[in-house]
Amino acid sequence: MKRNQVLFLTCAAAVVFLAVLHVGESAAVRSKDDPAPDKKESLKSKIFMQGSEASNFFKKRGKRSPKSQDEINAENRQRLSADERRREYYEEQRNEFENHVEEEQDEQEERSREQIEQWRQWHYDGLSPSYLYQRQNI
């Protein structure tokens, strides 16, 4: 009889143990409207790379290894385009400054011409012909 009791207690303990494990697993499963799968996906994206990144991962060179011709060409293209942009910028600035200086000189000439003309009109005595008629055609 003792043997039957031990067998019964062992089976009962196993059933209780399996029931506890089943409840534990079902509690670990999340419901569908839970936002946790998004976290799982973001964690997955942090751990795993995209295919394009993974293919380039092993192609990356070390710090001391020589550059490939493609890298050298790409760097030269970037350098040349930066130089061209810088050249265009400074040329534009120089043209704007030259235009500004030219306008200032034209305004100054206009003002001085007006002042000279006013002075001549004020000092004209009426006896000799006016300055306008004394201009020499070159």
From Swiss-Prot:
Respond yes or no to whether keyword Acetylation is given for this record: no
Q: What keyword terms does UniProt attach to this protein? A: Coiled coil, Extracellular matrix, Gamma-carboxyglutamic acid, Secreted, Signal, Sulfation
The residues of the propeptide are 28-64
- Report biased composition (Basic and acidic residues) as residue ranges: 67-102
Q: Which residues form the signal peptide?
A: 1-26
- Disordered: where is this region? 58-116
Matching Pfam families: UCMA
The protein's matches in InterPro entries, at most eight in alphabetical order, are given as: UCMA
Q: Which residues form a coiled coil?
A: 69-118
Q: In its keyword annotation, does this UniProt entry include Signal?
A: yes
Q: Which residues carry this modification: 4-carboxyglutamate?
A: 71, 75, 84, 88, 91-92, 96, 98, 102-103, 107, 110, 114, 117
Q: Which GO terms describe its cellular component?
A: extracellular region
Instruction: From the record, give the transmembrane residue ranges.
Output: none
Primary location recorded for the protein, binned into one broad class: secreted
A GO BP annotation: regulation of osteoblast differentiation
User: Which subcellular locations apply to this protein?
Assistant: Secreted, Extracellular space, Extracellular matrix
| Entry comment on modification after translation | Proteolytically cleaved by a furin-like convertase to generate a persistent C-terminal fragment found in almost the entire cartilage matrix, and affecting osteoblast differentiation. Sulfated on tyrosine residues.
**Functional note:** May be involved in the negative control of osteogenic differentiation of osteochondrogenic precursor cells in peripheral zones of fetal cartilage and at the cartilage-bone interface.
Name the family the entry cites.
Answer: Belongs to the UCMA family.
PANTHER family given in the database record? UNIQUE CARTILAGE MATRIX-ASSOCIATED PROTEIN
Q: What is this protein called?
A: Unique cartilage matrix-associated protein
Its organism's taxonomic lineage begins at: Eukaryota, Metazoa, Chordata, Craniata, Vertebrata
